[in-house]
Swiss-Prot record:
Function per UniProt: Negatively regulates transcription of bacterial ribonucleotide reductase nrd genes and operons by binding to NrdR-boxes.
GO molecular-function terms, A-Z: ATP binding; DNA binding; zinc ion binding
Pfam families: ATP-cone, Zn_ribbon_NrdR
Coiled-coil stretches: none
Species classification: Bacteria, Pseudomonadati, Pseudomonadota, Betaproteobacteria, Burkholderiales
Zinc fingers typed unnamed, residue spans: 3-34
A GO BP entry: negative regulation of DNA-templated transcription
Underlying gene: nrdR
Protein name: Transcriptional repressor NrdR
Segment forming the signal sequence: none
Amino acid sequence: MKCPFCSHQETQVVETRVSEDGDFIRRRRQCGACDKRFTTYERPEVNFPTVVKKDGRRVEYDREKLLGSFKLALRKRPVSTVQIDSAIERIEEKLLNLGQREILSSRIGELVMRELKKLDKVAYVRYASVYRSFEDIDEFRALVDEVRK
């Protein structure tokens, strides 16, 4: 595998670990030229449902986009990357178990909100305030009151 730092073609695997649930393999690699280390992840290739956007467009499921949503909502919050990865894996498992060829983006948004609510209430409110497109402060206040219960 090519080194992401110097683009040298030869890297060596120095450590391999299987995730707790066995869903992926984490490998630490070291470049033979610059000696820097980096991490790669191996996952089985699966076919996720096509995402149907609000405007009717159909796009491929994108794990990185989902990860970006989590990172934005959880910015400067005390949640580890391991917790975020676990939440994304639970969402992906649900998407695969649906057995459908297509899924509405709004359904994915609901799954994200459910996971964020479990991880961090502030992140949940951040995400929901954008996702639900509140019209006024009363809708926002109702969400905060719901979270406080």
